[in-house]
Amino acid sequence: MNELLHQHKAIPEDERNFALRPSLIEEFVGQSEIIENLKVFIKSAYERRATLDHVLLYGPPGLGKTTLAHIIAKELKVSLRSTSGPLLSKAGDLAAILTNLQPMDVLFIDEIHRLHRNIEEILYSAMEDCCLDIVVGEGCGARTLRIDLPAFTLVGATTRFGLISNPLRDRFGIPLHLEFYSVEELMLVIKRAAHVICTDIDDSGAYEIASRSRGTPRIALRLFRRVRDFMVVERQSIIDNHFADSALFNLGVDKSGLDKMDIKYLSFIYEAKNAVGIETIAAALSEDVGNIEETIEPYLLKIGFIQRTPRGRILTTKAIEHLMNYKYI
C-alpha cells in the first residue's frame, strides 16, 4: 500500500531544494489565467464546505502540474494522497486507496493517461457517485458489491492529453492546460529560488539562465542549481550574465537552450536529407518514442525548428541555420 500511496511530506535529505517549490497559490509564478480561475474555484469550494470539482492538469513536463496538486490540497486545508497511473495495475490497488481516503481529501494521480481501462471504469462511479462497484466471484456466482466512499477531489496530471479516454476526460469538471513560460516569468522563478537558498544573482544572470530554460520552470531550477555549483567552486560572489554563460557552456546548453540530445536529434534528421519517422529517430538515438515526443519535440516545435508531416519529421530553415551557426554540422 505504501508503494502505491503516500502523503505529501518534505524530503528530509534536501529540504532546501524542496522549498524551491511554492506551497501557496500566491507564490506560484506564471500560468496567470489558470491561477486566477483556480483561486475562484478553491475559494468557492472552501466557503461552501464542499469538495472541489475534479481537476485535470495537462501540458508538457516540468510546468508545475505536481506543484499545483500540492497547492490545491494545502489551500483547501485537506490531506493530499498521491500515486501514479502505472502503479495502479489491479482493481484492488485503486480500491485500497479510495477506501482509505478521508472526507474532502485530494487524491493526485500522476500520469493518469497510463491507467488501465479496467481501473478507469472503477473510477467512473467513484468520481461521479462517490461509490465503488466491485465484482465479487466469477461466472454464475458473480455479484456486484457497492461500497460508499467519502467525498473527495481527484486531481489528474498528464503530458499526453490525447491518450485519455473521452469518458474519463469528461468527468473532470476543471480541465486546465499549462503552457510554456515566458523568459520574464522564468526570471521570477529563478530569483525566488536564489532568495530561498541565499544566492546572489543579478537580472542579467537570471535572464541568461531563463532564456536557455526551454520555457520550463523545472529546467530553469535545474540549470540554476548547476550554475550555483560552479559559483561555489570558483568562489564567485554573484551570478551575472558572463558567469552564467560560461557555466552553461560547460553544461553543454547553447543560447537557444538546446542540449546534446537535441543536437543529436536535429543532426540525425539533417543528415537523412528527407523526412524521418519517429520510430527511426528513436532507434538511432537509443531513446524511447514517448520520451522524444514528450521532452524533446515540444520545445523544438515551439521555437520552430521542426515540422511534423505525414511522412515524418523535417527541419525548418531556422533549425538548419542554427546548426550551421554553431558549427554542429
Curated annotation (Swiss-Prot):
Segments for region (Large ATPase domain (RuvB-L)): 1-181
Binding positions (DNA): R308, R313
Residues that, per the record, bind Mg(2+): T66
Gene Ontology MF terms: ATP binding; ATP hydrolysis activity; four-way junction DNA binding; four-way junction helicase activity
A biological-process GO annotation: DNA recombination
Tagged with keyword Cytoplasm: yes
Entry GO CC: cytoplasm; Holliday junction resolvase complex
Keywords, sorted A to Z: ATP-binding, Cytoplasm, DNA damage, DNA recombination, DNA repair, DNA-binding, Hydrolase, Nucleotide-binding
SMART domains attached to this UniProt entry: AAA (SM00382)
Pfam family, one: RuvB_N
Matches recorded under InterPro entries: AAA+_ATPase (IPR003593), AAA_lid_4 (IPR041445), DNA_helicase_Holl-junc_RuvB (IPR004605), P-loop_NTPase (IPR027417), RuvB-like_N (IPR008824), RuvB_C (IPR008823), WH-like_DNA-bd_sf (IPR036388), WH_DNA-bd_sf (IPR036390)
Binding sites annotated in the UniProt record for ATP: L20, R21, G62, K65, T66, T67, R171, Y181, R218
Annotated region (Small ATPAse domain (RuvB-S)), positions in chain: 182-252
Locations listed in the record: Cytoplasm
Domain observations: Has 3 domains, the large (RuvB-L) and small ATPase (RuvB-S) domains and the C-terminal head (RuvB-H) domain. The head domain binds DNA, while the ATPase domains jointly bind ATP, ADP or are empty depending on the state of the subunit in the translocation cycle. During a single DNA translocation step the structure of each domain remains the same, but their relative positions change.
Function text: The RuvA-RuvB-RuvC complex processes Holliday junction (HJ) DNA during genetic recombination and DNA repair, while the RuvA-RuvB complex plays an important role in the rescue of blocked DNA replication forks via replication fork reversal (RFR). RuvA specifically binds to HJ cruciform DNA, conferring on it an open structure. The RuvB hexamer acts as an ATP-dependent pump, pulling dsDNA into and through the RuvAB complex. RuvB forms 2 homohexamers on either side of HJ DNA bound by 1 or 2 RuvA tetramers; 4 subunits per hexamer contact DNA at a time.
Quaternary structure annotation from Swiss-Prot or TrEMBL: Homohexamer. Forms an RuvA(8)-RuvB(12)-Holliday junction (HJ) complex. HJ DNA is sandwiched between 2 RuvA tetramers; dsDNA enters through RuvA and exits via RuvB. An RuvB hexamer assembles on each DNA strand where it exits the tetramer. Each RuvB hexamer is contacted by two RuvA subunits (via domain III) on 2 adjacent RuvB subunits; this complex drives branch migration. In the full resolvosome a probable DNA-RuvA(4)-RuvB(12)-RuvC(2) complex forms which resolves the HJ.
Family membership: Belongs to the RuvB family.
The protein's name in its UniProt record: Holliday junction branch migration complex subunit RuvB
